[in-house]
């Protein structure tokens, strides 16, 4: 410092002016800064970006140690949400990487100066040589930063993943490090509109780095098939990234509150045709108010029955139960008193909450009277009369927190199996189960603030509860709840009036809507998602021809909260139920007599806590070793698509050959698309078993079925030995055939000669 002062004094004595002196000092300082930057062990530009991002966006990095585990020639695969993603990548890497940049993007005038500050190579799908150059760079020890989507997202979700990006990883043999960036999508640097995202100037940015993985493609695949397989694997890695980095270590009520904070408390959460719209604030405050009354109905962690239709009141009641630390047991009011009481016994339910107006409108007085002899009936109308202004004010002040704190692994809800094959069992689902399944679905389907869900599936059904209510609530997507899926003329009109973009249903319901609807009623709908039963070809064709919409068929079971597999706009194959969702492991156990496929067992974070059975009331029976036996026989092809062959219990052994009853029913639905049919197997002394087809088709005959099956190339063994015509096939609330009742019809009939 003294030396510098003497030097300045000397220069002034020889006549150097102050401006020139200051300019010289600045030049020396700049040279010193450049020299320090060159000699520093870390990259000064990277450090500068890190300082800016940490200062303005409070950048938080999780799992940074996984970058070191990947080795020197790793491929860093990031989701692409904004123009700042490249700066984020530079700030978290110690080594100077090579950026794979889209060729067209790299040619833009304002991009060129930025690329000069980094090492970048253009990735041009039309020029294989560019891909080979990148493969060579990685093989020689370079770290490659790549955005597999090839463009900034305009949906808010994961977009198309290019095969070329996967080919680099597969050919180079390098480890792929999945990285997710969250927060920047809300800034002005993203390509999402204000309608798609709630804009924030300086949101917190979180970067999550997962464990490195290696692409391993089947050696038998060559050429285009190998390239596509690598692309599908990279998409799987990226969708797993989205799922695993979605918060699920919380309760459903906490997730709804978090959604309200992000999306806005005034945003519409739920809507029904009777009570209108409820904002997140009204929904959460209402739940907190009711929670104070629900605590008196049962002890903490105990089950309370909920018997309500799809309506705002059901959503408020469910969240209120969760806030109170009580477990809502969803009662299927279409199941009849015997099955309902068996369900109450299994779940140790002593109190059922319902609505007096609902009971009157649905004409359930007789059912409620039967239930009241065994369990206590509590009406919401009576509870509301006990709520004071003070209670409402307290709830408003405390609505951001549950009344009784619970953890993610505590029970959140009890659903009951359909009872289509026997006595209903209780299925205990945790908060983590529900939130994980919602996150699994959200990782594959792009939807957001501009969407609106229309849900007619009852909340006592796993599909209706998780996908139709919990998923939109925790995602900030408004949901329109309608109490009956059977109003085929009303539902299309309401979808049209609500401008709904996503519709859930079963084949039975979707077929009814399509027949009754005007061709313009579903003009706003983007996605039609079907589950619970196979989608018939006639239904699929009707929706495509009349509305220009394809039905995305999925598959799930109550025990997995429920979704397991789903066709998506990117990966869709008719005749299958799509590919398994992220986070789900599957194994197939061979079935005697079946040449391909096997009995499906699944494991994952969405698998239930366990069963509750009527012969062991209140005792939880967890799945063995975390694996659930779905009871379904399936095949999974090389590309991961799942095809349902039928229920393991619903195969008949005829003449030593296994025949799927579901396949016979499928043929019947194709032959008589306007009539519902079901097949029952009964003992036969000569051939082991015989098939009885029960159908609503008035003029159905065995000869007509046999001729159609032969024309379709089906086995002669699939022809039923007998056709039984009924006025109305017994069905469950989900629209599926009530197989217990159908079997009862067959067993109780007078045997008639086969037609």
Residue ranges and their predicted role:
Residues 435-452, 460-501, 516:
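Conserved AMP-binding/adenylation subdomain of ANL enzymes
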Residues 376-381, 652, 680-683, 692-694, ...:
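Conserved C-terminal "lid"/linker of ANL adenylate-forming enzymes
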Residues 14, 22-34, 40-41, 68, ...:
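Non-catalytic C-terminal accessory region of glycerolipid acyltransferases
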Residues 500-505, 514-573, 585-587:
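Gly/Ser/Thr-rich phosphate-binding loop
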Residues 352, 598, 604, 609-610, ...:
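AMP-binding/adenylate-forming catalytic core of the ANL superfamily
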Residues 296, 323-390, 499, 697-701:
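Structural core segment of the AMP-binding/adenylate-forming
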Residues 264, 378-416, 422-423, 446-452:
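Conserved pre-ATP/AMP-binding loop-to-beta segment of ANL
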Residues 268-298, 302-319, 336-341, 391-395, ...:
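Conserved AMP-binding/adenylate-forming core of the ANL superfamily
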């Amino acid at each position: 410092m003294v030396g510098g002062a003497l030097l300045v004094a000397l220069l002034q004595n020889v006549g150097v002016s102050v401006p020139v002196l200051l300019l010289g000092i600045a030049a020396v300082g700049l040279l010193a800064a450049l020299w320090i930057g060159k000699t520093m062990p870390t990259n000064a530009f990277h450090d500068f970006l890190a300082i800016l991002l940490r200062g303005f966006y409070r950048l938080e990095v999780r799992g940074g140690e996984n970058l070191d585990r990947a080795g020197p020639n790793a491929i860093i695969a990031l989701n692409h949400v904004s123009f700042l993603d490249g700066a984020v990548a530079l700030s978290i890497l110690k080594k100077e990487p090579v950026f794979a940049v889209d060729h067209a993007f790299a040619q833009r005038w304002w991009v060129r100066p930025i690329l000069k500050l980094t090492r970048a190579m253009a990735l041009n799908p039309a020029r294989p040589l560019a891909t080979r150059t990148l493969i060579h760079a990685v093989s020689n020890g370079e770290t490659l930063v790549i955005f597999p989507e090839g463009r900034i997202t305009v949906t808010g979700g994961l977009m198309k993943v290019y095969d070329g990006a996967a080919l680099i990883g597969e050919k180079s043999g390098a480890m792929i490090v999945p990285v997710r960036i969250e927060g920047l999508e809300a800034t002005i640097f993203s390509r999402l509109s204000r309608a798609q995202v709630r804009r924030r100037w300086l949101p917190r940015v979180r970067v999550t780095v997962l464990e490195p993985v290696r692409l391993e493609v089947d050696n038998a695949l060559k050429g285009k098939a190998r390239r596509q397989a690598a692309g599908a694997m990279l998409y799987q890695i990226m969708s797993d990234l989205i799922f695993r980095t979605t918060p699920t270590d919380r309760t459903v009520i906490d997730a709804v509150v978090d959604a309200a904070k992000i999306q806005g408390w005034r945003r519409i959460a739920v809507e029904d045709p009777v009570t209108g719209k409820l904002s997140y604030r009204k929904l959460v405050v209402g739940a907190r108010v009711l929670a104070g009354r629900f605590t008196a109905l049962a002890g903490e962690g105990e089950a309370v029955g909920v018997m309500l239709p799809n309506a705002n009141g059901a959503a408020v009641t469910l969240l209120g139960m969760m806030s109170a630390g009580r477990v809502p047991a969803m009662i299927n009011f279409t199941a009849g008193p015997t099955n309902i009481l068996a369900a109450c016994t299994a779940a140790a339910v002593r109190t059922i909450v319902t609505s007096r107006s609902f009971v009157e409108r649905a004409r359930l007085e007789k059912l409620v009277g039967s239930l009241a002899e065994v369990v206590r009936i509590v009406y919401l109308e009576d509870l509301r009369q006990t709520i004071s202004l003070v209670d409402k004010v307290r709830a408003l002040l405390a609505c951001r927190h549950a009344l009784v704190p619970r953890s993610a692994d505590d029970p959140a809800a009890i659903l009951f199996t359909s009872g289509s094959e026997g006595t209903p069992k209780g299925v205990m689902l945790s908060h983590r189960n529900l939130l994980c399944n919602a996150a699994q679905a959200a990782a594959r389907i792009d939807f957001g603030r501009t969407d609106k869900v229309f849900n007619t599936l009852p909340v006592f059904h796993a599909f209706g509860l998780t996908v139709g209510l919990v998923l939109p609530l925790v995602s900030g997507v408004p949901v329109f709840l309608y109490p009956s899926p059977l109003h085929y003329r009303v539902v299309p009109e309401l979808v049209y009036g609500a401008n709904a973009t996503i519709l859930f249903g079963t084949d039975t319901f979707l077929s009814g809507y399509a027949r009754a609807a005007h061709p313009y009623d579903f003009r706003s709908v983007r996605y039609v998602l079907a589950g619970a039963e196979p989608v018939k070809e006639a239904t699929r064709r009707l929706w495509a021809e009349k509305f220009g919409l394809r039905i995305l068929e999925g598959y799930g079971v109550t025990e997995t909260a429920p979704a397991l597999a789903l066709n998506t706009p990117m990966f869709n194959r008719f005749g299958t139920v799509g590919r398994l969702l992220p986070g789900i492991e599957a194994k197939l156990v061979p079935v005697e007599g079946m040449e391909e496929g096997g009995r499906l067992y699944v494991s994952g974070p969405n698998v239930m806590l366990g069963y509750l059975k009527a012969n062991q009331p209140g005792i939880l029976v967890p799945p063995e070793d975390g694996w659930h036996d779905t009871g379904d026989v399936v095949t999974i092809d090389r590309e991961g698509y799942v095809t349902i062959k039928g229920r393991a219990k619903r195969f008949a052994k005829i003449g030593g050959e296994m025949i799927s009853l579901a396949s016979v029913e499928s043929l019947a639905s194709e032959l008589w698309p306007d009539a519902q049919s079901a097949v029952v197997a009964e003992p036969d002394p000569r051939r082991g078993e015989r098939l009885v087809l029960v159908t609503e088709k008035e003029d159905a005959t065995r000869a007509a079925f046999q001729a159609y099956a032969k024309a379709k190339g089906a086995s002669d063994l699939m022809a039923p030995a007998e056709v039984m015509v009924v006025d109305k096939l017994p069905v469950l609330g989900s629209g599926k055939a009530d197989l217990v009742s159908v079997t009862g019809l067959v067993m109780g009939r007078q045997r008639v000669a086969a037609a």
